[in-house]
Design a protein with these regions (language model features):
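C-terminal cell-surface anchoring/sorting signal
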Residues: 195-219
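Helix-boundary and membrane-interface capping/anchor signal
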Residues: 1-188
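Generic low-complexity segments that are intrinsically disordered, proline-rich and/or Lys/Arg-biased
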Residues: 147, 191-193, 216
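Short, threonine-centered small-residue motifs that mark membrane-proximal processing/anchoring sites
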Residues: 179-204
Length: 219
Protein backbone atom coordinates (compact mmCIF):
# COMPACT_ATOMS: atom_id res chain seq x y z
CA UNK A 1 0.00 0.00 0.00
CA UNK A 2 0.99 3.65 -0.31
CA UNK A 3 -0.52 6.65 1.45
CA UNK A 4 0.30 10.35 1.69
CA UNK A 5 -1.19 13.28 3.58
CA UNK A 6 -0.45 16.92 4.37
CA UNK A 7 -1.79 19.42 6.90
CA UNK A 8 -1.29 23.16 7.30
CA UNK A 9 -2.19 24.43 10.78
CA UNK A 10 -2.78 28.12 11.60
CA UNK A 11 -1.53 29.17 8.18
CA UNK A 12 -2.25 32.84 8.79
CA UNK A 13 0.22 34.71 10.98
CA UNK A 14 -1.95 36.61 13.46
CA UNK A 15 -0.80 38.22 16.72
CA UNK A 16 2.42 36.27 16.75
CA UNK A 17 0.74 32.84 16.48
CA UNK A 18 3.13 30.58 14.54
CA UNK A 19 2.14 28.57 11.49
CA UNK A 20 2.97 24.89 11.13
CA UNK A 21 2.86 22.16 8.50
CA UNK A 22 2.87 18.38 8.72
CA UNK A 23 3.56 15.90 5.94
CA UNK A 24 3.65 12.11 5.82
CA UNK A 25 4.31 9.59 3.06
CA UNK A 26 4.33 5.82 3.63
CA UNK A 27 4.68 2.79 1.39
CA UNK A 28 4.82 -0.95 2.10
CA UNK A 29 5.64 -3.64 -0.42
CA UNK A 30 4.85 -7.32 0.21
CA UNK A 31 4.89 -8.71 -3.32
CA UNK A 32 7.05 -8.42 -6.40
CA UNK A 33 7.19 -4.87 -7.72
CA UNK A 34 7.68 -1.36 -6.43
CA UNK A 35 6.02 0.90 -3.85
CA UNK A 36 6.21 4.68 -3.74
CA UNK A 37 4.52 7.58 -1.94
CA UNK A 38 5.16 11.31 -1.73
CA UNK A 39 3.72 14.42 -0.12
CA UNK A 40 4.44 17.84 -1.55
CA UNK A 41 3.52 21.29 -0.23
CA UNK A 42 3.83 23.61 -3.21
CA UNK A 43 4.56 27.06 -1.94
CA UNK A 44 3.05 28.98 -4.84
CA UNK A 45 -0.48 27.88 -3.99
CA UNK A 46 -0.64 26.59 -0.45
CA UNK A 47 1.88 28.26 1.87
CA UNK A 48 2.44 31.90 0.96
CA UNK A 49 2.44 34.91 3.29
CA UNK A 50 2.06 38.36 1.73
CA UNK A 51 2.90 41.54 3.61
CA UNK A 52 3.92 45.15 3.08
CA UNK A 53 6.52 47.34 4.76
CA UNK A 54 6.45 51.13 4.67
CA UNK A 55 10.11 51.79 5.40
CA UNK A 56 13.43 49.96 5.47
CA UNK A 57 13.02 47.01 7.83
CA UNK A 58 14.59 43.83 9.16
CA UNK A 59 13.02 40.36 9.26
CA UNK A 60 13.64 37.25 11.37
CA UNK A 61 12.31 33.85 10.29
CA UNK A 62 12.58 31.17 12.98
CA UNK A 63 11.14 27.70 13.52
CA UNK A 64 11.68 24.33 15.18
CA UNK A 65 12.20 21.23 13.04
CA UNK A 66 13.33 17.66 13.66
CA UNK A 67 14.65 15.87 10.58
CA UNK A 68 14.66 12.12 11.32
CA UNK A 69 15.37 9.66 8.52
CA UNK A 70 16.13 5.97 8.25
CA UNK A 71 16.59 3.65 5.27
CA UNK A 72 17.03 -0.05 5.97
CA UNK A 73 17.28 -3.31 4.04
CA UNK A 74 17.28 -6.50 6.13
CA UNK A 75 17.21 -9.69 4.07
CA UNK A 76 15.81 -12.96 5.42
CA UNK A 77 16.16 -16.12 3.28
CA UNK A 78 14.89 -16.74 0.66
CA UNK A 79 14.91 -12.96 0.08
CA UNK A 80 17.99 -11.92 -1.87
CA UNK A 81 17.85 -8.20 -2.65
CA UNK A 82 15.96 -4.98 -2.00
CA UNK A 83 16.24 -1.21 -2.21
CA UNK A 84 14.80 1.50 0.06
CA UNK A 85 14.99 5.28 -0.37
CA UNK A 86 13.74 8.28 1.62
CA UNK A 87 13.88 11.94 0.62
CA UNK A 88 13.11 15.27 2.26
CA UNK A 89 13.54 18.87 1.15
CA UNK A 90 12.65 22.34 2.41
CA UNK A 91 13.10 25.66 0.68
CA UNK A 92 12.15 29.20 1.76
CA UNK A 93 11.93 32.15 -0.65
CA UNK A 94 11.38 35.83 0.20
CA UNK A 95 10.86 38.26 -2.66
CA UNK A 96 9.57 41.78 -3.19
CA UNK A 97 6.72 41.40 -5.64
CA UNK A 98 6.01 45.12 -6.16
CA UNK A 99 6.97 48.59 -4.94
CA UNK A 100 4.84 51.12 -3.10
CA UNK A 101 3.02 53.37 -5.57
CA UNK A 102 5.02 56.52 -6.29
CA UNK A 103 8.40 55.18 -5.12
CA UNK A 104 11.41 55.49 -7.39
CA UNK A 105 12.49 52.19 -8.92
CA UNK A 106 15.04 50.24 -6.84
CA UNK A 107 16.54 46.74 -7.22
CA UNK A 108 14.17 44.11 -5.81
CA UNK A 109 15.34 42.22 -2.70
CA UNK A 110 15.41 38.42 -3.03
CA UNK A 111 16.36 35.72 -0.51
CA UNK A 112 16.41 31.93 -0.93
CA UNK A 113 17.26 29.53 1.90
CA UNK A 114 17.50 25.74 1.75
CA UNK A 115 18.75 24.64 5.20
CA UNK A 116 21.51 22.07 4.71
CA UNK A 117 23.27 21.97 8.07
CA UNK A 118 25.83 24.62 7.05
CA UNK A 119 25.50 28.20 8.27
CA UNK A 120 25.80 31.25 5.96
CA UNK A 121 24.52 29.41 2.88
CA UNK A 122 21.43 31.55 2.16
CA UNK A 123 21.32 33.35 -1.19
CA UNK A 124 20.70 37.05 -0.49
CA UNK A 125 20.38 39.73 -3.18
CA UNK A 126 19.77 43.47 -2.74
CA UNK A 127 19.46 43.33 1.06
CA UNK A 128 21.68 44.65 3.85
CA UNK A 129 22.78 41.28 5.23
CA UNK A 130 21.66 37.70 5.88
CA UNK A 131 22.57 35.43 8.79
CA UNK A 132 21.20 31.87 8.81
CA UNK A 133 21.49 29.17 11.47
CA UNK A 134 21.12 25.58 10.18
CA UNK A 135 21.78 23.07 13.01
CA UNK A 136 20.85 20.11 10.79
CA UNK A 137 20.13 19.52 7.13
CA UNK A 138 16.50 19.61 5.98
CA UNK A 139 17.48 18.58 2.45
CA UNK A 140 18.55 14.94 2.30
CA UNK A 141 18.30 11.89 0.04
CA UNK A 142 19.15 8.50 1.52
CA UNK A 143 19.13 5.06 -0.04
CA UNK A 144 20.35 1.54 0.74
CA UNK A 145 20.51 -1.84 -0.99
CA UNK A 146 20.59 -4.25 -2.67
CA UNK A 147 22.23 -6.05 0.26
CA UNK A 148 21.75 -5.71 4.01
CA UNK A 149 22.44 -2.14 5.08
CA UNK A 150 21.06 0.71 7.19
CA UNK A 151 21.61 4.46 7.06
CA UNK A 152 20.10 7.16 9.29
CA UNK A 153 19.98 10.94 9.51
CA UNK A 154 19.44 12.63 12.90
CA UNK A 155 17.41 9.66 14.15
CA UNK A 156 16.28 9.80 17.78
CA UNK A 157 17.44 13.36 18.43
CA UNK A 158 15.48 16.36 19.67
CA UNK A 159 14.26 19.13 17.40
CA UNK A 160 16.57 22.02 16.54
CA UNK A 161 16.01 25.76 16.28
CA UNK A 162 16.53 27.31 12.84
CA UNK A 163 16.64 31.01 12.02
CA UNK A 164 17.25 33.44 9.19
CA UNK A 165 17.85 37.13 9.94
CA UNK A 166 17.57 39.60 7.05
CA UNK A 167 18.40 43.30 7.31
CA UNK A 168 17.85 46.21 4.95
CA UNK A 169 14.57 45.21 3.29
CA UNK A 170 13.33 48.19 1.26
CA UNK A 171 9.77 49.48 1.13
CA UNK A 172 7.38 47.34 -0.86
CA UNK A 173 5.05 44.36 -1.03
CA UNK A 174 6.60 40.97 -0.26
CA UNK A 175 5.80 37.26 -0.33
CA UNK A 176 7.36 34.53 1.81
CA UNK A 177 6.95 30.99 0.50
CA UNK A 178 7.78 27.48 1.71
CA UNK A 179 8.22 24.47 -0.56
CA UNK A 180 8.41 21.18 1.34
CA UNK A 181 8.64 17.64 0.00
CA UNK A 182 8.79 14.17 1.57
CA UNK A 183 8.89 10.99 -0.50
CA UNK A 184 9.71 7.29 -0.16
CA UNK A 185 10.39 4.48 -2.60
CA UNK A 186 10.83 0.73 -1.99
CA UNK A 187 11.64 -1.85 -4.66
CA UNK A 188 12.27 -5.59 -4.70
CA UNK A 189 14.83 -7.17 -7.00
CA UNK A 190 13.70 -10.80 -7.29
CA UNK A 191 15.36 -13.99 -8.37
CA UNK A 192 12.70 -15.40 -10.75
CA UNK A 193 10.31 -17.69 -8.94
CA UNK A 194 12.17 -17.58 -5.60
CA UNK A 195 11.82 -14.17 -3.98
CA UNK A 196 9.08 -12.30 -2.21
CA UNK A 197 10.32 -9.07 -0.62
CA UNK A 198 8.64 -7.19 2.18
CA UNK A 199 9.44 -3.50 1.98
CA UNK A 200 8.19 -0.46 3.77
CA UNK A 201 8.89 3.21 3.81
CA UNK A 202 7.80 6.21 5.82
CA UNK A 203 8.52 9.90 5.44
CA UNK A 204 7.13 12.92 7.23
CA UNK A 205 7.82 16.63 7.40
CA UNK A 206 6.86 19.14 10.07
CA UNK A 207 7.64 22.76 10.86
CA UNK A 208 6.80 25.07 13.72
CA UNK A 209 7.12 22.93 16.83
CA UNK A 210 6.22 19.75 14.96
CA UNK A 211 8.36 16.76 14.09
CA UNK A 212 9.99 16.06 10.76
CA UNK A 213 10.59 12.37 10.17
CA UNK A 214 11.54 10.20 7.22
CA UNK A 215 12.02 6.44 7.20
CA UNK A 216 12.35 3.73 4.58
CA UNK A 217 12.74 0.02 5.20
CA UNK A 218 12.91 -3.20 3.26
CA UNK A 219 13.10 -6.63 4.81
Amino acid sequence: FAIANAEITSAQLVNGTPSSTKQVAEAELQISGQGQASTNIQSNTTWTFSFSIGETANMVLSFLANPEMKADVTLVPPYTAGNAQANMSADFTLRRISQISGDAATPAPFVNWSPDGVNTNAVCVNVGSCVDVDPESLNETMGVGPGNSTVTHSLGTAGSNYSLTITGLTRGNYSLTLAGLTSVNVTQVPEPGTLMLLGGALAALGFGGTRRRSQATAA
